Amino acid sequence: MSDPITLNVGGKLYTTSLATLTSFPDSMLGAMFSGKMPTKRDSQGNCFIDRDGKVFRYILNFLRTSHLDLPEDFQEMGLLRREADFYQVQPLIEALQEKEVELSKAEKNAMLNITLKQRVQTVHFTVREAPQIYSLSSSSMEVFNANIFSTSCLFLKLLGSKLLYCSNGNLSSITSHLQDPNHLTLDWVANVEGLPEEEYTKQNLKRLWVVPANKQINSFQVFVEEVLKIALSDGFCIDSSHPHALDFMNNKIIRLIRYR
């Protein structure tokens, strides 16, 4: 049995065997480790490959088993496909193509469920009336919460690209607030009368905007209208059997379905 070989792939170390690396002779790795192509070394003497180290584990596992094993919530399919193209592992490229067809079929039929909650609370803040002179004030504030679930990860990504948080005076994508690929929770406030801009930052109050309309969402009615525009354009339709009509009209529950 040959000695173990340690690879440095983009800064991540992997240890394997020569037999594994040459299991597909026509691949770039097969050429590199059969002496047909030169290899580079890092300062520790490990074989260095200047590619993405994170997804290389899936490529290495495929070399070992000839099976494509990915977690259910895998989100780097595009990156893995590019890396497979680089290493020229043809059976892996074909397995990825089959996997993408499978995922595409699963994404066509989808369900979208949104539960909405709203409350009013009092916010206290200081107002600068003159240099060194401040007064304490308060105002009612509408606080909104939307709990969004969809069986389509791609739709949630699309929705996340259209909605932006306004915080610290800047607009930022809400995609970082995805709890997992199928869940998204949003919390935001409407404009508060008399509240200075710096107080939104100080009290960590986020406002919500939608693009490309560049419209601030100050009510559930506007939120529902904008989400429906995005969902309907992506092939969803309202599920007339659920929820109860009163819940839908009162903006408490929204359920949409998509059949393709």
From Swiss-Prot:
Keywords from the UniProt entry: Coiled coil, Growth regulation, Tumor suppressor, Ubl conjugation pathway
A Pfam family hit: BTB_2
Domain of life: Eukaryota
Any one GO biological process: protein ubiquitination
Protein name as annotated: BTB/POZ domain-containing protein KCTD21
Assembly with partners or alone: Homopentamer. Interacts with KCTD11; KCTD21 and KCTD11 may associate in pentameric assemblies. Interacts (via BTB domain) with CUL3; indicative for a participation in a BCR (BTB-CUL3-RBX1) E3 ubiquitin-protein ligase complex.
SMART domains: BTB (SM00225)
Lineage: Eukaryota, Metazoa, Chordata, Craniata, Vertebrata
Coiled-coil intervals, chain numbering: 88-112
Entry keyword annotation includes Acetylation: no
Domain BTB: 3-72
Known function: Probable substrate-specific adapter of a BCR (BTB-CUL3-RBX1) E3 ubiquitin-protein ligase complex mediating the ubiquitination and subsequent proteasomal degradation of target proteins. Promotes the ubiquitination of HDAC1. Can function as antagonist of the Hedgehog pathway by affecting the nuclear transfer of transcription factor GLI1; the function probably occurs via HDAC1 down-regulation, keeping GLI1 acetylated and inactive. Inhibits cell growth and tumorigenicity of medulloblastoma (MDB).
Annotated metabolic or biological route of this protein: Protein modification; protein ubiquitination
